[in-house]
């Protein structure tokens, strides 16, 4: 229990994590107020009656009365109302910082531009299967503070750059940045700002896991901090990687020790091999038994909307990667599936487009040229993507997702893969990426 119950805690921004922070601080006996720019913010009816509320705009007066401001991850610290409070010396933190103060339970902290939900869920399952009392959440599923209700012995947290911006000295047991590619530059300004936010995950960390295929994931930490890497090449001693046989068999390995064939994983594609290796390294860091982890890998079916296998129609496999909302995620999906079907002369037909968030789509050129037979373009930034991919492959426009799926089917031949991985946000045509994914599945189900 925290001793001080003095000054006012002001939560800025409701939504899932804001509601969680209000309720947690209230239960702990703090004076709590909340402000949100929306007239009726989501969750306004899920907080205690005696919490002071100020909705319709961020209440500068209220913020300036705070002893501390708890900022929801959806709000940028750069907002003028928040900057005014910072200028007055008022600390601005996030719910993850509140969580760290409130518990001594070891934290496994996971971030990355892509694959963090898959790795967080898979690793949580590994810990559970190994008999740990584990709670999984953060940016995924349940907010961090709600996890304490489970009285866990281990916290597995997926953390976004927005959450890490307001977190210092997380002191994680082990932390990993899975990969780094352009994302959220509209919020962080440039790649450096994004990089700095992500690397806050390593403050006070006890052990580090990093991706040796991506130098931006390797932190500057004291030499005494144990570090272990994963990657898709042959690993050095005590590192995780891939050993390839002459017949094309791929083994996930630790040093020279072969652990499991890639074909034994339920989730396919080289990007998922990297995810599995990251989990094995995290598991070693907290002492999970190898045999148990390998068993979990054989069973884990992946997540909805994340390179999710939908069905096979006329010997063509359809994958829903609607969660691919940035270029890095789509690259991973195209490369992962493209490399897997290449030995059988299979090609990818990819559906791209939506709201591009100012990204550089030319980063897709090399992979599109290598693996993609046709790209079907949808959404408000289709034109921009077409310009970036000119002369790489067949580029076709579609006005609806249904039209895109129909066109994709016309290009596809046996052994090919049709992949929805838009590299864009979805709000121009859909309620969100789950809606886009469900509509894609419905379109595929309607194919004959």
UniProtKB/Swiss-Prot annotation:
SUPFAM superfamilies in UniProt: MurCD N-terminal domain, MurD-like peptide ligases, catalytic domain, MurD-like peptide ligases, peptide-binding domain
- The answer to whether keyword Nucleotide-binding applies is yes
NCBIfam families given in the database record: murD
Q: In which pathway does it act?
A: Cell wall biogenesis; peptidoglycan biosynthesis
GO CC annotation: cytoplasm
- The superkingdom listed in its UniProt entry is Bacteria
Protein's name in the database: UDP-N-acetylmuramoylalanine--D-glutamate ligase
Q: What does this protein do?
A: Cell wall formation. Catalyzes the addition of glutamate to the nucleotide precursor UDP-N-acetylmuramoyl-L-alanine (UMA).
Chain's gene name: murD
What organism does this protein naturally occur in?
Answer: Acinetobacter baylyi (strain ATCC 33305 / BD413 / ADP1)
């Amino acid at each position: 229990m925290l001793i001080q119950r003095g000054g006012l805690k002001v939560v800025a921004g409701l939504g899932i994590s804001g509601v969680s922070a209000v309720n947690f601080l209230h239960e702990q006996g703090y004076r709590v107020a909340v402000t949100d720019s929306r007239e009726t913010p989501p969750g306004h009816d899920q907080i205690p009656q005696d919490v002071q509320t100020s909705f319709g705009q961020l209440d500068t007066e209220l913020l300036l009365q705070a002893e501390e401001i708890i900022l929801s991850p959806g709000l940028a610290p750069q907002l003028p109302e928040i900057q005014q409070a910072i200028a007055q010396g008022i600390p601005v933190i996030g719910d993850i910082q509140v969580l760290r103060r409130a518990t001594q339970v070891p934290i496994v902290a996971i971030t990355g531009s892509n694959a963090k939900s898959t790795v967080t869920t898979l690793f949580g399952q590994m810990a559970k299967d190994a008999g740990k009392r584990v709670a999984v959440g953060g940016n995924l599923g349940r907010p961090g503070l709600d996890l304490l209700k489970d009285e866990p012995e281990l916290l597995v947290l997926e953390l976004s750059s927005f959450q890490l911006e307001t977190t210092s000295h997380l002191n994680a047991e082990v932390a990993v940045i899975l990969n780094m590619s352009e994302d959220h530059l509209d919020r962080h300004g440039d790649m450096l700002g994004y990089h700095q936010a992500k690397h806050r995950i390593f403050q006070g960390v006890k052990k580090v896991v990093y991706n040796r295929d991506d130098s931006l994931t390797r932190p500057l930490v004291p030499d005494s901090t144990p570090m272990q890497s994963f990657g898709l090449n042959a690993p050095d001693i005590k590192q995780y990687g891939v050993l390839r046989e002459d017949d094309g068999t791929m083994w996930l390995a630790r040093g020279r020790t072969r652990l499991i064939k890639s074909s034994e994983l339920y989730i396919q594609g080289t990007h998922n091999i990297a995810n599995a290796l990251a989990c094995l390294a995290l598991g070693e860091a907290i002492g999970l038994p190898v045999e148990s982890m390998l068993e979990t890998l054989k069973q884990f079916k992946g997540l909805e909307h994340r390179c999710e296998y939908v069905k096979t129609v006329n010997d063509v496999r359809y994958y829903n990667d609607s969660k691919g909302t940035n270029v890095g995620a789509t690259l991973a999906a195209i490369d992962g599936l493209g490399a897997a079907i290449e030995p059988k002369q299979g090609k990818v037909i990819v559906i791209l487009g939506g709201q591009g968030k100012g990204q550089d789509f030319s980063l897709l050129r090399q992979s599109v040229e290598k693996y993609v037979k046709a790209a079907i373009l949808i959404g408000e930034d289709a034109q921009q993507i077409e310009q970036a991919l000119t002369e790489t492959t067949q580029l076709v426009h579609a006005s609806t997702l249904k039209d895109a799926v129909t066109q994709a089917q016309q290009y596809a031949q046996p052994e090919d893969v049709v992949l929805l991985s838009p590299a864009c946000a979805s709000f121009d045509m859909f309620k969100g990426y789950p809606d886009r994914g469900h509509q894609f599945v419905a379109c595929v189900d309607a194919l004959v």
